[in-house]
């Protein structure tokens, strides 16, 4: 429960309104090819109605992962079962799902509830059933129970989703994560708003409102701080804000451009873009001491730094070849090498958490789309077909990318799986949305 408790501490500090999605999630492609899974409503073992439907959270998470497709509850062969002991393997032979999630919820003191869930391997259960009677332990992939409060139902639903996803894919789930983004609503006197929400757009909280532009939010590796660019003082400045204490620290306010902050893997420094010495160049600034080190030195524009996971190199966008392309600089030697060659432009790059791929914006035939390049084979795959894509940010498990795009003339957020198969759009209820950033694991 340590992970859930840490996440809840942040959620309580940030959330001042009931759980509600500020960003809708409209899935546009990829569900039909997903892996079928059964998620049954958790059986309520108390008086009246259950506080919340945990199974609904789990089903929504699994759909949004792009990997799984929960089956319609009405077509499931058993109803109102909450434990593996009630599961009848022979009844599920024609369902076609690979796993079943089921559970129970019951009161456990004042504002406390005991939540239990089981994850059943349906394929293994059916194969074993053909050989004769089997015990539940032979096909049980996971079984847990936890005491939570009513306020923790949604978060624990995300935790169950994380467990199920990892058990079935071998990849850590990223459902207990958050996103930051900028909302622009010109009907308000201070139209620029820096927001934080759960990964699915629920529990949105405003961190800052300004009459001047806000841009480029990025998370610290521990998920405790955000760095961003603000023009609130009529010039570009970089701030770091603690999400727990709300304390803001001005990190960079040099003449000219102060932009594109990116936390180092140890969280102690920021890679930033400064133009204080002429052309925009890449620098590293120590957050505590404000000491800076210049990394690039070229007459062309260098911007949009991003760290390799090992902290030994940066990638950045540069026009030193005539058009925007992505380059790598080794911090120990200063050696610079060009990384991208396909298409007209390539910019806004970031390395996936496993260090194997790069996600970036590719322009080909005048169209801006999100692309992925395998760093070992150099094979590039265009992932999206939306318009004017920008600002890609990778989920901490490397399976999904959130990015800004244009839909029906408005700036919105969208998501695409890193294999390009699953796609979704995240329109806001009010205003336009841009500059998304996905948190680390929390």
Swiss-Prot record:
Key words, A-Z: Cell cycle, Cell division, Periplasm, Signal
Pfam families: PD40, TolB_N
Signal peptide interval: 1-21
GO-annotated biological processes: cell division; protein import
Annotated GO CC locations: periplasmic space
Compartment(s) where it occurs, according to its Swiss-Prot or TrEMBL record: Periplasm
Main location, first listed in the record: periplasm
Chain's role: Part of the Tol-Pal system, which plays a role in outer membrane invagination during cell division and is important for maintaining outer membrane integrity.
Entry's family note: Belongs to the TolB family.
HAMAP family: TolB
Oligomer status and interactors: The Tol-Pal system is composed of five core proteins: the inner membrane proteins TolA, TolQ and TolR, the periplasmic protein TolB and the outer membrane protein Pal. They form a network linking the inner and outer membranes and the peptidoglycan layer.
Name this protein carries in UniProt: Tol-Pal system protein TolB
Organism per entry: Shewanella baltica (strain OS223)
High-level lineage: Bacteria, Pseudomonadati, Pseudomonadota, Gammaproteobacteria, Alteromonadales
Name of the gene encoding the protein in the UniProt record: tolB
């Amino acid at each position: 429960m340590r992970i859930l408790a840490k996440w809840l501490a942040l959620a309580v500090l940030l959330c001042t309104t009931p759980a509600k999605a500020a960003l809708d999630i409209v899935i546009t492609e990829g569900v039909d090819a997903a892996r079928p899974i059964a998620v049954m409503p958790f059986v309520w073992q108390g008086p009246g109605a259950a506080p919340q439907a945990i199974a609904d959270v789990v089903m929504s998470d699994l759909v949004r992962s792009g990997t799984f497709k929960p089956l319609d509850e009405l077509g499931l062969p058993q109803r109102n079962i909450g434990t593996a002991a009630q599961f009848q393997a022979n009844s599920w032979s024609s369902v076609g799902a690979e796993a079943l999630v089921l559970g129970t919820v019951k009161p456990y003191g004042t504002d406390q509830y005991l939540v239990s869930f089981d994850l059943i391997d349906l394929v293994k259960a059916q194969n074993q059933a053909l050989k004769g009677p089997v015990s539940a332990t032979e096909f049980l992939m996971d079984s847990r129970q936890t005491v939570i409060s009513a306020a923790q139902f949604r978060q624990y639903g995300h935790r169950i989703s994380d467990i199920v996803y990892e058990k079935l894919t071998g990849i850590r789930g990223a459902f207990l994560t958050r996103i930051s983004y900028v909302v622009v609503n010109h009907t308000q006197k201070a139209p620029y708003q820096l927001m934080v929400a759960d990964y699915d757009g629920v529990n949105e909280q405003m961190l800052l409102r300004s009459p001047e532009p806000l841009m480029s939010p990025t998370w610290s590796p521990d998920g405790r701080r955000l760095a961003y660019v603000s023009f609130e003082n009529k010039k570009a400045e970089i701030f770091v804000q603690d999400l727990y204490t709300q304390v803001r620290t001005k990190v960079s306010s040099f003449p000219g451009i102060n932009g594109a902050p990116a936390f180092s893997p140890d969280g102690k420094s920021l890679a930033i873009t400064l133009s204080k010495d002429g052309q925009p160049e890449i620098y590293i600034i120590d957050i505590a001491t404000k000491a800076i080190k210049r990394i690039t030195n070229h007459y062309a524009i260098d911007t949009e730094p991003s760290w390799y996971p090992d902290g030994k190199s940066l990638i950045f966008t540069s026009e030193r070849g005539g058009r925007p392309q992505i380059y790598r600089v080794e911090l120990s030697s200063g050696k610079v090498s060009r990384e991208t060659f396909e298409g007209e432009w390539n910019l806004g790059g970031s390395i996936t958490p496993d260090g194997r791929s790069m996600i970036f914006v590719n322009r080909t035939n005048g169209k801006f789309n999100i692309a992925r390049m395998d760093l070992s084979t150099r094979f590039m795959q265009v992932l999206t077909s939306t318009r004017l894509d920008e600002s890609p940010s990778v989920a901490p498990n490397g399976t999904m990318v959130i990015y800004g795009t244009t839909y029906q003339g408005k700036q919105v957020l969208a998501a695409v799986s890193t294999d390009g198969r699953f796609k979704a759009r995240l329109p806001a209820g009010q205003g336009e949305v841009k500059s998304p950033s996905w948190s680390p694991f929390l």
